[in-house]
């Protein structure tokens, strides 16, 4: 087991990391004792970096963290990961009023937020930086470019109403998995990836499990690899099979309170993977999919997804997905609160 030292801020850098074996573990904070300092796990590489093939199963590729053992990464618990506006924020304003209390320890100066659009133009999504916090009032470092509604719409007869307030998500975490930037990054869109999977070698099965909470994925995913047998998403579970809630031997996987901050493919996918809990995550700027599910019994609860780009169709669509529990589906524009 490799446990990352939590005595100081840490930065680790590699082209490929592979965790392989029943007793092989990479630990950076646990659910009971989250990582307290700042940690950056930087994955390096570009389109010319040699792939790391597995003996069978999906290709690990490059700029990758492969999990065929156990991975535990837990950052500091940020509390509420997203909320809504309590009042309309006008274009040109540098303050927003939130509808719910947030933890000022994490919703703090320097932290990044994403504010969803409330018009028909998805590119009115705004990524902003906090300058100061006073209760539910947040002052930003720059003025807003667009109006974001904080309102409720009701039918004239009062028979129904809808909250149409813009969502506000917290993107910053103290633990980050980062795709290293490079000169051709904008053209190649080749970010970091985490693959949780299994393979067999000489009669032994190496199966991966991952517990990931309060982690920020920065410049993740690799554009162009979208097939179910090789999904180069920010985080993909492939042939993971069953997660067992609370299993003491570690056969449990979940993704909770994470932020996917600027992705070059889908943020997250589950393929031949069952019973994984994916809850309270904030997803900003994805390609093709926000989250893709091809498993059974996976639980997607209270996740916010903003700005999904469908490049092949040459159009953009903003996905705002709040709460859904379903399986055997591809998630495109699911709204169910």
Language-model region placement:
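Short glycine/acidic-rich loop motifs that flank beta-strands on beta-rich extracellular proteins
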Residues: 7, 23-25, 38, 181-190, ...
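Short, conserved beta-turn/loop elements at beta-strand boundaries and strand-helix junctions
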Residues: 132-138, 222-223
């Amino acid at each position: 087991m490799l446990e990352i030292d939590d005595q100081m801020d840490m930065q680790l850098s590699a082209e490929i990391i592979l965790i392989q074996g029943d007793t092989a573990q990479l630990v950076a904070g646990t659910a009971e004792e989250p990582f307290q300092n700042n940690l950056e796990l930087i994955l390096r590489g570009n389109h010319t970096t040699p792939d790391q093939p597995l003996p069978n199963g999906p290709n690990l590729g490059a700029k990758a963290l492969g999990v065929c053992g156990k991975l535990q990464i837990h950052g500091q618990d940020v509390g509420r990961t997203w909320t809504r506006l309590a009042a309309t924020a006008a274009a040109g304003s540098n303050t927003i009023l939130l509808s719910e209390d947030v933890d000022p320890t994490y919703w703090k100066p320097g932290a990044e937020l994403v504010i969803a659009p409330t018009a028909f133009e998805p590119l009115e999504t705004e990524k902003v930086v906090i300058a100061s916090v006073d209760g539910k009032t947040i002052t930003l470092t720059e003025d807003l470019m667009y109006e974001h509604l904080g309102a409720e719409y009701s039918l004239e007869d009062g028979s129904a109403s809808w909250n149409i307030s813009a969502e506000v998500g917290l993107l910053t975490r103290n633990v980050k998995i980062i795709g290293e930037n490079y000169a051709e990054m904008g053209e190649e869109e080749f970010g970091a990836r985490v693959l949780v999977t299994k393979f067999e070698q000489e009669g032994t099965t190496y199966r991966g499990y991952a517990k990931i909470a309060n982690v920020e994925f920065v410049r993740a995913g690799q554009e162009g690899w979208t097939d179910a047998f090789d999904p180069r998403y920010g985080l993909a579970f492939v042939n993971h099979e069953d997660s067992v809630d609370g299993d003491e031997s570690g056969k449990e996987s979940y993704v909770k309170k994470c932020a996917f901050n600027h992705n070059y493919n889908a943020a997250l996918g589950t393929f031949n993977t069952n019973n994984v809990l994916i809850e309270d995550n904030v997803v900003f700027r994805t390609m093709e999919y926000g989250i893709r599910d091809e498993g059974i019994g996976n639980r997607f609860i209270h996740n916010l997804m903003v700005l999904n780009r469908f490049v092949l169709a040459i159009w953009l669509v903003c996905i705002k997905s709040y709460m859904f529990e379903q399986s055997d589906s591809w998630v495109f524009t699911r709204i169910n609160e």
